[in-house]
């Protein structure tokens, strides 16, 4: 018989009552529980293309900024072409899975789900993207692909329609592969000096966060939160990221590019009882407001970066997909809310697809 000291009994009771809550299963934001929009029984004109060849080779790719100076802001057309060619199968997988999952969540056609599972299963069985021979561009592709795949997977895993219920063996194999990729991503992006931590680290943290929730891995969740805090504390009082200001004419574009992963991480953290909104005096809010102001009038970015800004990316609506999680965190009003509505829907394969359906499912009815 176990004897419990009266002094320790209350503590043990508290642990029993609240300890489980502290380690509750990880969950995504509420929108990921949405079911299939309108179930269609036939396969329609959907045809499953053959899965792209699993990429198991060396992750050494040319950078599209090859030959550029330290600012890494001048595009090398020949290098970009070589990069696109060598990473084509990876990008085809990312975009294809995102598209098929989106189609399935809209129409519920079994062939759409089966095809997405076939593609992911083919790569999982090959243990693709796990090469230990990589350069910076290669490890960047690994984490981008993981974020795309895990982000899409969350819509299947948590949907009230339970599409994976009849595919548990396949799902387990795919999720184990995601977990291996996430563990490697943690190794790839850990321990960097502050001057080397920029948007790449934030995107790595997003991929790990998405995988943490998909696989219920608290260690991965904690790492993503830790990396988020590093990023948030890089935002200065005026809302600038010093390491992105180094990108010269693309400083504003890279500030904008840093926002999607940070906003998604904060949103996922909040869903699990970790409120990151106030980190570094509301850094994420400050960063977003600065980018929105810069998109209207880039003069402050021009002054801080020391060169006129390239606004090409700032004219593409999908580049503002971060507004969905950001507005869910900070409750946008007025001009910001109007701008968000004007640009919806937001579809970003690197965030797992249609983020408007996740965060603002009634958006279409507002138009």
From Swiss-Prot:
Q: Which GO terms describe its molecular function?
A: poly(beta-D-mannuronate) lyase activity
| Entry similarity comment | Belongs to the polysaccharide lyase 5 family.
* Gene3D superfamilies linked: Chondroitin AC/alginate lyase
Record's protein name = Alginate lyase
E.C. numbers: 4.2.2.3
The record's section on SUPFAM superfamilies has:
Chondroitin AC/alginate lyase
State the gene name recorded for this protein: algL
Q: Where is the signal peptide?
A: 1-24
Q: State where the protein is found.
A: Periplasm
Reaction(s) catalysed by this chain, per the record, are: Eliminative cleavage of alginate to give oligosaccharides with 4-deoxy-alpha-L-erythro-hex-4-enuronosyl groups at their non-reducing ends and beta-D-mannuronate at their reducing end
Could you tell me the superkingdom of the organism this chain comes from?
A: Bacteria
The UniProt record gives the binding positions of substrate as 63-64, 136-137, 254
UniProt keywords (A-Z) are: Lyase, Periplasm, Signal
GO BP annotations of the record are: alginic acid catabolic process
One Pfam family linked to the record: Alginate_lyase
């Amino acid at each position: 018989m176990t004897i419990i000291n009266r002094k320790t009994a209350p503590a043990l009771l508290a642990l029993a009552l609240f300890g489980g809550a502290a380690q509750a299963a990880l969950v995504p934001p509420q929108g990921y529980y949405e079911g299939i929009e309108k179930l269609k029984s036939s396969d329609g004109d959907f045809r499953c293309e053959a899965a792209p060849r699993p990429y198991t080779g060396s992750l050494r790719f040319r950078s599209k900024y090859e030959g550029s100076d330290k600012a890494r802001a001048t595009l090398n057309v020949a290098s970009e072409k070589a990069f696109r060619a060598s990473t084509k199968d990876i990008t085809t997988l990312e975009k294809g899975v995102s598209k098929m999952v989106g189609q399935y969540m809209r129409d519920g056609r079994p062939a759409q789900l089966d095809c997405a599972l076939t593609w992911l299963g083919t790569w999982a069985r090959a243990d693709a993207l796990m090469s230990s021979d990589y350069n910076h561009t290669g490890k960047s592709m690994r984490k981008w692909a993981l974020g795309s795949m895990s982000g899409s997977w969350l819509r299947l895993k948590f949907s009230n329609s339970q599409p994976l219920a009849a595919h548990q063996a396949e799902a387990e194999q795919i999720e184990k592969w995601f977990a291996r990729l996430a563990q490697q991503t943690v190794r790839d992006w850990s321990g960097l000096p502050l001057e080397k931590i920029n948007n790449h680290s934030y995107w790595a943290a997003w991929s790990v966060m998405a995988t943490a929730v998909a696989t219920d891995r608290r260690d991965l969740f904690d790492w993503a939160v830790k990396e988020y805090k590093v990023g948030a504390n890089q935002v200065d009082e005026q809302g600038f990221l010093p390491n992105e200001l180094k990108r010269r004419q693309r400083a504003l574009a890279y500030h904008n590019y840093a926002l999607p992963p940070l906003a998604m991480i904060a949103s996922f953290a909040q869903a699990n009882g970790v409120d990151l909104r106030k980190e570094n005096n509301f850094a994420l809010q400050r960063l977003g407001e600065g980018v929105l102001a810069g998109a209207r009038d880039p003069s402050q970015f021009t002054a801080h970066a020391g060169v006129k800004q390239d606004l090409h990316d700032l004219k593409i609506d999908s580049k503002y997909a971060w507004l969905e999680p950001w507005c869910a965190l900070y409750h946008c009003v007025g001009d910001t809310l109007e701008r968000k509505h004007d640009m919806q829907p937001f579809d970003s394969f690197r965030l797992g697809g249609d983020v408007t359906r996740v965060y603002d499912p009634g958006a279409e009815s507002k138009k």
